[in-house]
UniProtKB/Swiss-Prot annotation:
Constituent of pre-60S ribosomal particles. Required for large subunit rRNA maturation, in particular processing of the 27S pre-rRNA at the A3 and B1 sites to yield 5.8S and 25S rRNA. One of its GO terms (cellular component) is nucleus. It comes from Saccharomyces cerevisiae (strain ATCC 204508 / S288c) (Baker's yeast). The modification Phosphoserine is found at residue 69. Residues 43-53, 67-83 have a biased composition (Acidic residues). Belongs to the RRP15 family. This is Ribosomal RNA-processing protein 15. The keyword Nucleus applies.
Amino acid sequence: MGSKHRVDTKDKKRTRKNAEFGREKRNSGNQELSNEPEKDTIMEGDEAEEDEQNSSSDESSKIIDNEQSDAEEDDDEEEEDDDFPRKKKSKNSKHDDGSTGFSAAVNAILSSHLKAYDRKDPIMARNKKVLKQSESEKLEYKAKKALLAEKKKLLGKARKTDIIPIASGEDRSENIRKVLEKETALRKIAQKGAVKLFNAILATQVKTEKEVSENLSEIKNKEEKKELITEVSKEKFLDLVKAAAGSDNE
C-alpha cells in the first residue's frame, strides 16, 4: 500500500507538472499573439519613419539638383558672355607707334625685284587686273567725249550764233538798233501766235463736247464714236486756225 501511494503521488505530481507546463505554453502563446500586433505597429511606425526620411532625403536631393542646375545655368551664361569678341591686347607697347613695322614693309617693297615692263607703273605691278580695268574705263570715257564733240559740231553747223551784232570800233549803232527792233517784233508775233493757238484748241474742245452730247449720243459703239470725234475736232480746229489767220491778214 505504501508503494502504491507513492506511485500515485508521483503520478499526481507529474500530471500537475504537465498541466502547469501546458498552462505556461498557452500563456506564452497568448502573449506571443498579443505581442504580434504590437510588433506590427512598431514595424509600421519604423516604415513610416523610413518613408519620412526617404521623402526628406528626396526633397533635399531635389533642392541640391535645382541648385546645381542654377549654378550650371549661371556658368552657361558666363560662357556665353565669354563668347563675345573681346578686344585683343596689342603686342605693341603704348609708346610704339608702328613706325618700325611700316619701315620694314616699305623696305621689303623697295627691295623687291621688278621686271623691265613693270618699272613704268611699279605701284600696281602685282595687281594687273585693276590696271586693265582702269585703262578700259579711260578709253570708254575718251570715246564718249569724242562722240559728244562730233554731235555738237553737227548741231552747231545750222545755228547762227551772231544774231545780234556786237559793237566794234566802227559806227554800227544804227544797224544794231534795227536788228534789236526786228527781234522784238518777231517775239511779239510768236507770242500772239502761241496765244491764238491755245485759244483755238480750247474752243475746239468745247465745241466738240457740245456736238458729241447733242448729235452722237445715239451711237453706242465706242470706236466709231472716237473716230467721229477726232474727225469733227480736226475740222473745227483747222477752221478756227484759218479764221484766225484771215483776221490777222485783214
